[in-house]
């Protein structure tokens, strides 16, 4: 097995994104914040924006359902950059070290409306040979079609690719398509995991 291409997810692997970074300054208690994020402005709701739904439509839908939280819902996208704390520096350093030795690609579930902010504000994105953004394609992981789109667009062979993601469902989908994979958890040392692939 020869790895030629390394494919990175962004959130949870290279970037520290969490809605709590915004809402911990909005709600008085963690209990209120967690209720809002677990039951109202949920990750499932946000995933539809990653799939291509507009921020305006998503906000209006939720405000109509929960008018008592109208102000807090509006903040989700108007103050979105606050959720992006910054890079996961040790992994970004690994990415920089891989540049020039491997073909590097990004495969991310990210809204087409907010991804440009990150792309313009973090220089490491320029290291990638190509990036597939779910919101631009109207497809999200773990749908196998977005993995196939990546392979087709950049003429890649899955068995020569190493896919790195923090979501196990996304990892399972990639494995089913013959990608090599690394699942990044809270205790994962990415450098050690790469060494298992002689990288």
What are these regions (language model features)?
Residues 101-103, 179:
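A generic structural motif
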Residues 1-4, 111-112, 119-199:
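Asp-based, Mg2+/Mn2+-dependent phosphohydrolase catalytic module
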Residues 25-26, 65, 101, 121, ...:
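Alpha-helical structural context
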């Amino acid at each position: 097995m020869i790895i030629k291409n390394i494919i990175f997810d962004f959130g949870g692997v290279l970037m520290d994104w969490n809605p709590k970074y915004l809402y911990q300054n909005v709600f008085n208690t963690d209990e209120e914040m967690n209720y809002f994020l677990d039951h109202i402005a949920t990750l499932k709701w946000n995933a539809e924006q990653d799939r291509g739904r507009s921020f305006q439509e998503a906000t209006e839908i939720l405000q109509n359902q929960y008018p008592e939280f109208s102000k807090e819902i509006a903040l989700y996208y108007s103050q979105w950059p606050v959720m992006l704390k910054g890079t996961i520096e040790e992994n970004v350093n690994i990415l920089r070290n891989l540049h020039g030795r491997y073909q590097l690609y990004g495969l991310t579930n990210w809204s087409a409306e907010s991804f440009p902010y990150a792309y313009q504000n973090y220089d490491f994105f320029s290291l990638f040979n190509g990036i597939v953004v779910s919101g631009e394609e109207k497809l999200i992981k773990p749908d196998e079609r977005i993995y196939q789109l990546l392979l087709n667009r950049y003429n890649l062979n899955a068995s020569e690719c190493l896919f790195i993601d923090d979501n196990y469902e996304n990892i399972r989908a990639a494995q089913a398509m013959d990608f090599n994979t690394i699942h990044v958890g809270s205790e994962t040392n990415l450098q050690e995991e790469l060494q298992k692939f002689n990288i």
